[in-house]
Amino acid sequence: MKRTIFLAALLALALVSACQSREQQYVGKAVRLMDKYGLFAEGPSWEQTRAAALEAKPATMDEAYEITRTALKVAGGKHSFLWTVDSQNKSAVEDAGTEPSVTRLEGDVLHIVIPAFSGQSTDENRRYIHTVLDKLPEAAAGVVIDLRGNTGGNMYPMIAAVHRFLPDDVILKFKGRRFTTQVSRSFVLRTVGIEAQPAIDCPVALLTDSLTASSGEALLLCFRGLDNVRSFGAPTAGYASANSPHPMPDGSQLVLTQSCDQARTGEVFCDDPIAPDEPTDQPLEAALAWLRSR
């Protein structure tokens, strides 16, 4: 009897899907993903938005995209977006990226620029990481890690590039609706496939601006709460959250925010900018002055 009821329910679901247009099926799948993974997919606002999306009758894929985007902003917040095939192709052409760099400033102070990075392949990751690691000395009097303009991307190569300045423990947490995930330094290194190098014990200054976002903010928070660390510059962009891409039938990606960033201090960050320890319009000069005093 139970089996009969179950089969009947499956048949009814199949009939409903068969009666829906391609555009309605697209919206339906997007809403199901938001229901399951969306950081803010709960409460009256989401229920109202969800119902409106499912009741809509999009006639074109552009209309389906717009309905999906409207729902996405409620379920996932400002860090979520719909990445269409056209957008992906344009991004692939534009995403040449900037190389990280290591230079010596006064004395034995290092200046490490960690730019945005969206690479995913092993070769791309290792090239980015070793551009920094291969230029680091055995010791330093201090280091300036420059995150200005780092709009995000793949955080693991960024963290791995400066792992010698981080402790070998949990460096960040992701706090979702139903879960909290810990990120350790060793996990990051395993993910990118490199061996840990000896620690460099020195004061760390971090530079931020209004473009420091997403993975750039995550890297900033990896240092939050550590002794002998100070940040300088301007408040960040306020995208301190983690999102994941979910493939859609037409090749687009539903990039959905699933968790907020949590520092070792217990502080949870998400849509609000992260203020620097020392606000200044001359962050490099201020950082060097602080390092001289250590």
Language model segments and positions:
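Extended, small/polar residue-biased N-terminal targeting/export presequences
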Residues: 39-107
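STAS-typified acidic loop motif
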Residues: 99-127
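Terminal peptide-recognition signature
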Residues: 30, 71, 112, 145, ...
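Bacterial N-terminal signal peptides
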Residues: 8-14
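Gly/Ser/Thr-rich loop/hinge elements
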Residues: 152-205, 241-251, 258-262, 268
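A short, well-ordered alpha-helical element
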Residues: 121-141
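Short, glycine-/small-residue-enriched flexible loop/hinge segments at domain edges that mediate gating
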Residues: 140-155
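Bacterial Sec-dependent signal peptides at the C-terminal "C-region" and cleavage site
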Residues: 15-22
